[in-house]
Amino acid sequence: EAVLLMRRANKAAGDARTVLDANLFPQTIAVIRGRAEALGFEVEVADLTGPDGGLPEGAISGIVLQQPGDDGSVVDHSGVIAAAKDRGAMVTVVADLLALTLIVPPGEQGADVAVGNTQRFGVPLFFGGPHAAYLAVREGLERSMPGRLVGVSKDQQGRTAYRLALQT
């Protein structure tokens, strides 16, 4: 969903490809490739750890990074994020919530979208799912998010009430 959100929101990039860091989990790469094939857009896997970010030449609509990476490394992604932004690309970071208690969050590094799984916070295993996850966006991308946003309000008697704040 984050890749599709970047493609919807980054109208300036047109039909440019999405670049995936080679240090993403293999299952994440497989899911994104499957969606890309079904929807007809190009995906490229590249090592994005180089000094210039390792971004391939040509037009890019967005990049996807992971923190920590598949190999367990914790990398400062601010350089590749800045390089991607300079080229008009949006950035998604797949981030482990527990790791974010110790490292710089994706939003503070300039990422547009952060996603991840929350199963490690005590949701019991349930034969592969379902379990909770999160999708967070920078300000201004809320209307590009899929689904519905629920807001907290007060009813006529002053009690807490939940309402649909946004539906896409």
Regions found by a protein language model. Give the residues of each.
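Active-site core of PLP-dependent enzymes with the aminotransferase class I/II
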Residues: P68-R87, L98-P105
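PLP-dependent aspartate aminotransferase-fold enzymes
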Residues: E1-A59
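Buried hydrophobic positions in well-ordered alpha/beta secondary-structure cores of metabolic enzymes
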Residues: I32-R33, I63, D96, A133
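Short acidic loop-to-helix transition motifs that present clustered carboxylates
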Residues: F25-P26, A46-G53, D70-D71, L97-T101, ...
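Conserved active-site segment immediately N-terminal to the catalytic lysine
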Residues: G107-V123
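Active-site C-terminal subdomain of aminotransferase-like
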Residues: P124-T168
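Pyridoxal 5′-phosphate
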Residues: V45-T49, I63-V64, I81, V91-A95, ...
